[in-house]
Amino acid sequence: FVSVTYGAGGSTQERTHTTVARLVAETSLTPAAHLTCVGATRDEVDEVARRYWAAGVRHIVALRGDPPAGASEYVPHPGGYAQAEDLVRGLKRIGDFEISVGAYPETHPAALSADADLDFLKRKIDAGATRAITQYFFEGETFLRFIDRCHAKGINVPIVPGILPVSNFQQ
């Protein structure tokens, strides 16, 4: 699959929709459209998901999302999905999406502990996610230990290692 971010880097959400719709219509690639909880009501997020479904998009990467520019911490939008697990449940009500969620081999920076972070991942899986995609990491052993910890928690969905491609060899 090809992961397509949601309004990242200053692009619009409409541009993201156009991109994934074109991937479905014009290529043999399977797009995984990112969808976040940030800055929108449930109805607005649900409408985006319905448009993805109507365009033939069947794979969503459901993320809480980062705080908006200028904000130091995440605050749920009034009337919006509070967390990724809520978004996963909402998406499952709309369609039988394949849903990927974020995972953190080195623990999410806002997590109270590594164990609490795994509990949160388990809730996202139990809500209906079919796969986890990790943040990037630098040591392969970190990923292998993470997989072992996931299995010990009863998390048995595929876990895809996130990679950060080198885009500037001089850096």
Regions found by a protein language model. Give the residues of each.
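Active-site mouth loops of central-metabolism enzymes
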Residues: 31-43, 98-116
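Short, acidic/polar
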Residues: 16, 42-50, 112-123
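Glycine-rich, proline-tolerant flexible connector loops at the mouths of alpha/beta enzymes
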Residues: 1-18, 65-79, 130-146
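Alpha-helix-loop-beta-strand connector modules within alpha/beta enzyme cores
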Residues: 10-33, 79-101, 144-163
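Hydrophobic faces of well-ordered beta-strands that scaffold small-molecule active sites
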Residues: 2-4, 31-35, 60-62, 99-103, ...
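Non-catalytic positions within long, well-ordered alpha-helices that form the structural scaffold/packing
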Residues: 53, 125-126, 151
